Structure formats: C-alpha cells, structure tokens
C-alpha cells in the first residue's frame, strides 16, 4: 500500500479499468462507491478531481496544456523508443493510453531496461501523480515545454503499464470515463452518508459551491453538517438556473399562475458576473472563467452601485453604427486567446442583466423574483449604455404576451423568457423547472426552432466522406434518469471543413462500447462519451419506434424523432452535455406542433 494518508495510483487505475469496461450505470456508481470508501480522506479530493479528468474545478481554469506531440515525445523518451515508431503506433490505434501500455509492457519497455539495466519501479501514489500533473499545468514561460516533457517522462518511468494508460489520457484530457457530476454525488452520498436525504444536502451544497473535490474532502473529514453549511461566495460561481420551453402564450400564463415577468431572450452569451470592490470575475454557463475575453465587460460591471454582488446577464454583440443587436455567431470572435483588444474594438458588446443572486453578504436565492428585480434596478447605473437591465414587463394576458414576443423578435432577440413572480419564484440553482419558461418561435409543421443535442455515436462515411463520419447519432438529455436518449441521426448541414474537423473533435471521446448513460436501440459504428453538443434543426418532430427519447411516454413502443435533421453549423461549446435540450422540452415541442397542425387544418 501507499504511504499513510495516500492511495497507490494502481488502485485508481484498476477502478478506472472496471468503470471503462462497464455499460451499466449502476455498476459504474457501485465501483465509485467502493473506490471512495477505499480512499483515505487526505486524498479524496485529488481522487475526485482525477476521476473528473481535471486537477481543479472548472471555474479555476487549471489546464494541463499538453499537446499531443509533446506527450508522444515524452512517451518515446520514457520507453526508449524512436519518436517515429511511437507516432506510427499512435496513428494505428488512435489511443495514446493504449500505446503507452503496449510500449511499457513490451520487453525493453523503459529507458533503463532498454540499456539492459533491470529497474525496480517505486510505487506511484495518487499524491505523486497529482503533484506531477499540477507541475505540468503550472509550467510557463521560457523552458516550460521541457519542464512538461521531463516531468511527464519521470512519471511514466515510474508508472506500471496500466497506470501509464490513464496518466497519458488524463494529460491529454481524454480520460473517457464520462462520469457525470451527479453520479459522483450519488457515490459520495452512498460512501459517506448513506441516505437519500443526505444526497439532497450534498447536491444543494454543490449547486452553491460546484467543486466536487472540495465537497468530497469536507464530507469525508468533517461530515454532512459541514457540507450543509456551505454558503454562496463571491468568486465561486453557482450552478445557473435553467428553463423549460413552451410555444403557446395561454399555456405559459396558465403554468405561471396567470401572470409572469416576460423578458427579452437575447441571442448572446450568458454570464455570471462576480464583483468584489474593483475585482470582477466573469463565468460562462459552463462555469468557465471567461474574464480574459471580456475586459470591457469587467469595466462595465465595476460601475454597479454595490460593493459586492453576483449578477446574471447576457453579453450581446451589437453594431456600433446602428445600435442593432448582432447574432450569437458574431460574439464567438471575442473568444480569442490573443488580440483581445483588437476583437474588443471590432466586436463591441453590451450586457443586459436579468438577475441578482447575492449582494453584500446576503444570499438572495430564496427571495421571489419581483424582489430580486427591484434590487437589481437599484444597483444598475441609470442611463448607462453598456450595462443595462433586460427589457421586461409584467403580463397577464395571452395577447399582450404574444405582442411582447413579436416586439422581442423584431429587435433581434431569440424570443422571450417568461418567469414566475409569485411568492415561490426563488432562484433554483442548477435546476430546470416551470418557474422559468422559454417562449420561442412557434413550432408549426416545419420545425422553426433549433435544439441542442449531444453526439453519442457515429457512423463511418463512404465515398466522399470516407475517413470521417457520414452521420452522427444525436441524443437529448433526461435529467430524471441522468441519461442521454437518442432522437435522430444527422448527416446533413456539415461543410467539407466540418467533416474534416469531426474526427479531431470527436475521437478523443471514442469508447469501445455504448456509454452507460446512453439509452439507444440503434447500434452505432462508433460510440462516444456524451460531451459534444451541436445545434440541430429539422422538418418536424415525429413518433418513431427507433428512438428512445420519450419512449412509451406518448405512445406504447414509440419514442420521438426529428425528421430530416440538419446541423446548423453552430457548435455549442458553451454548453455542457447536461445543458442540452431535454426530453421534456422535446415532448412539449411535439405536443405544441401537433396542436398547431390541428388548428391549421
């Protein structure tokens, strides 16, 4: 065994191998429970981070930053092979982990063995692997590449073949276990608290403080009460509240108790802005730190009339000559790593704020929306043209709501967000519910609204598409079961450039069997960990015996499918797979489409 308070990395590698080989979600959770029970509390945080394929929570932005070429160089050096031989083997297999395992298992698999000297490898621990990976992530400036290579070489020389497989996959961000945060929460609750009530407490804490490593360590060392007492903190993003969708104004008002706050749904990038004095941090919908991309937005947020706050809004690109809002695609020019100042001048933005979650030491999530809106109105500077309140009005009539919706569309918005303003209109962190409802363009016989679906499988291309994917199997997310259910196979809408890019984009997520969280009747040629989200449009939503989305929910033996699906060209890198269109949204779209068709006939 490893040192006291540590865990041999081989134990982790053994569990990863078991998790990787199962297509059962329950088995995956059971393996995690067993792993967490075996892990000393001192390193439970590191085990959780490594299992997520990262070193720190998303919002800290710690990236390993190891390119494929650099990893291959390190492997060649560690195994005593020629770089070309290692590259050729990698081209054949496409899995650097498998290449490492093969090279380090083979006779002469290691530099000292290569020169005929037997070597006694010391046992690697989780702490040693984690520290080495952190050293690689933090290497910068002159000589950083050599530091990364040398650190990785030293790690691989001490690693057993199976350990090397997972170390290299981790380094390249290709662990491929596809374990959802919610599955880790299930396993932590079972391992350390053992009840459904405890699971709810842990999830609630996670929505306020989405750092699973930190929560795991707190739970293992100080217990459930310490986890339950976690508070919202400026600088740590909360999980954003999500919305359902409907397309009938009367039905929306009925769901929201007869009246609602209707608010423009801007075609921009959702942002959670944290202000503490003159310090401002910006986080995306995925909780990534995007402060660097928007130095102008940082300045706008500083103008808020408050010392400390967490506010939510939408960053929207606009035409400085006309003042008109520009579509989301224009905003993507702002996501550059370099020439940020140039992009800022070429693509100016405004921020439209729609919520406040925390202010001057007080959590506001339990306050109803109308009160939060009043607080927000007080802190936004009057007459400011860069940081503004979202355009909104209280409506209690279907005609008024429709008129407001048409006004929003004419001004370049996607539609309208309709929000409950009753006493129970709290801010539900991380939850999708009927307190917020998206009202977007009507789903007539042709599907005029897009959906965001997750790539779960692929089919080999033929002819012109040989060497890439001819079609992709797409799925919607079901939060009830934490699974991805298929809804279509899409092969149209991809440009030649897209097709060339698909293997590069998807192959890092390739796995040898259907992922445990994917529910599919269709057998794909290739399976992927659910990770990549694409925007899809189609002719209509129909019943289908082939797909599993809403299976048996509308008709026995049938699920929902999108007819004539087409990729719009928009990659939703801003969305985690769990933020994709849900099964319940597709059910509502189908019902709405059917109702509209009946009215038209």
From Swiss-Prot:
Record flagged with keyword Protein biosynthesis: no
Function: DNA ligase that seals nicks in double-stranded DNA during DNA replication, DNA recombination and DNA repair.
Keywords of the record: ATP-binding, Cell cycle, Cell division, DNA damage, DNA recombination, DNA repair, DNA replication, Ligase, Magnesium, Metal-binding, Nucleotide-binding
Name assigned to this protein: DNA ligase 2
Alphabetized InterPro entries for the sequence: ATP-dep_DNA_ligase (IPR050191), DNA_ligae_ATP-dep_bac/arc (IPR022865), DNA_ligase_ATP-dep (IPR000977), DNA_ligase_ATP-dep_C (IPR012309), DNA_ligase_ATP-dep_cent (IPR012310), DNA_ligase_ATP-dep_CS (IPR016059), DNA_ligase_ATP-dep_N (IPR012308), DNA_ligase_N_sf (IPR036599)
Family of this protein: Belongs to the ATP-dependent DNA ligase family.
EC number: 6.5.1.1
Reaction(s) the record says it catalyses: ATP + (deoxyribonucleotide)n-3'-hydroxyl + 5'-phospho-(deoxyribonucleotide)m = (deoxyribonucleotide)n+m + AMP + diphosphate
Xref: HAMAP family: DNA_ligase
Organism: Thermofilum pendens (strain DSM 2475 / Hrk 5)
A molecular function GO annotation: DNA binding
Gene Ontology terms: biological process: cell division; DNA biosynthetic process; DNA recombination; DNA repair; lagging strand elongation
Binding positions (ATP): 263, 270, 285, 314, 354, 432, 438
């Amino acid at each position: 065994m490893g040192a006291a308070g540590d865990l041999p990395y081989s134990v982790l590698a053994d569990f990863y191998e078991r998790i990787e080989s199962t297509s059962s979600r329950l088995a995956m959770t059971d393996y995690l429970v067993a792993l967490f029970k075996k892990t000393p509390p001192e390193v439970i945080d590191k085990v959780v981070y490594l299992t997520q394929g990262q070193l720190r929570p998303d919002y800290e932005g710690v990236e390993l930053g190891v390119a494929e070429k650099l990893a291959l160089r390190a492997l060649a050096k560690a195994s005593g092979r020629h770089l070309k031989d290692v590259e050729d083997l990698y081209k054949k297999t496409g899995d650097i982990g498998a290449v490492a395992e093969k090279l380090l298992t083979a006779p002469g698999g290691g530099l000292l063995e290569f020169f005929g000297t037997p070597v006694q490898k010391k046992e690697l621990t989780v702490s040693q692997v984690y520290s080495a990976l952190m050293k690689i992530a933090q290497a910068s400036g002159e000589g950083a590449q050599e530091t990364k290579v040398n650190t990785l070489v030293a790690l691989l020389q001490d690693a057993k073949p199976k350990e090397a497989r997972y170390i290299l996959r981790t380094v390249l961000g290709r662990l491929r276990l596809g374990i959802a945060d919610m599955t880790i929460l299930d396993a932590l609750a079972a391992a350390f608290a053992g009840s459904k009530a405890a699971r709810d407490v842990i999830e609630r804490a996670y929505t306020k403080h989405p750092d699973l490593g930190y929560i795991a360590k707190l739970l293992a060392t100080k217990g459930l009460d310490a986890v339950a007492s976690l508070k919202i903190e400026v600088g740590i993003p909360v999980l954003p509240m999500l919305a359902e969708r409907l397309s009938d104004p009367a039905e929306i008002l009925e769901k929201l108790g007869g009246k609602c706050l209707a608010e423009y749904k801007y075609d921009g990038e959702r942002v959670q802005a944290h202000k503490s004095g003159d310090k401002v941090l910006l986080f995306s919908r995925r909780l990534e730190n995007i402060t660097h991309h928007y130095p102008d937005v940082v300045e706008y947020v500083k103008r808020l009339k408050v010392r400390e706050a967490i506010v939510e809004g939408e960053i929207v690109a606009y035409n400085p000559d006309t003042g008109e809002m520009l579509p989301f695609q224009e905003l993507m020019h702002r996501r550059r790593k370099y020439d940020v100042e140039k992009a800022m001048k070429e693509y100016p933005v405004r921020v439209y704020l729609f919520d406040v979650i925390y202010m001057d030491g007080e959590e506001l999530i339990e306050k109803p929306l109308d009160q939060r809106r009043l607080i927000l109105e007080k802190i936004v500077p009057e007459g400011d043209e860069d940081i503004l309140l979202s355009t909104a009005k209280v409506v209690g009539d279907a005609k008024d709501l429709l008129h407001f919706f048409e006004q929003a569309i004419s001004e370049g918005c996607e539609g309208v967000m309709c929000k409950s303003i009753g006493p129970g209109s709290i801010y539900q962190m991380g939850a999708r519910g009927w307190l917020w409802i998206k009202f977007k363009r009507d789903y007539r016989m042709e599907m005029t609204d897009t959906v965001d679906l997750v790539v779960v499988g692929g089919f080999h291309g033929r002819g012109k598409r040989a060497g890439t994917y001819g079609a992709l199997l797409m799925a919607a997310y079901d939060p009830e079961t934490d699974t991805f259910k298929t809804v279509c196979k899409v092969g149209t809408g991809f440009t030649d450039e897209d097709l060339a890019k698909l293997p590069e984009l998807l192959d890092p997520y390739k796995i040898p069997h259907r992922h445990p969280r994917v529910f599919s009747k269709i057998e794909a040629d290739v399976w992927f960990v659910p990770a990549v989200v694409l925007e899809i449009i189609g002719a209509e939503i129909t019943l289908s015996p082939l797909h599993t989305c809403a299976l048996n929910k509308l008709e026995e033996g049938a699920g929902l499918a999108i007819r004539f699906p087409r990729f719009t060209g928009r990659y939703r890198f801003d969305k985690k797979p769990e933020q994709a269109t849900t099964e319940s949204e597709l059910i509502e779209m189908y019902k709405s489409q059917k109702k509209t068709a009946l009215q038209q006939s």
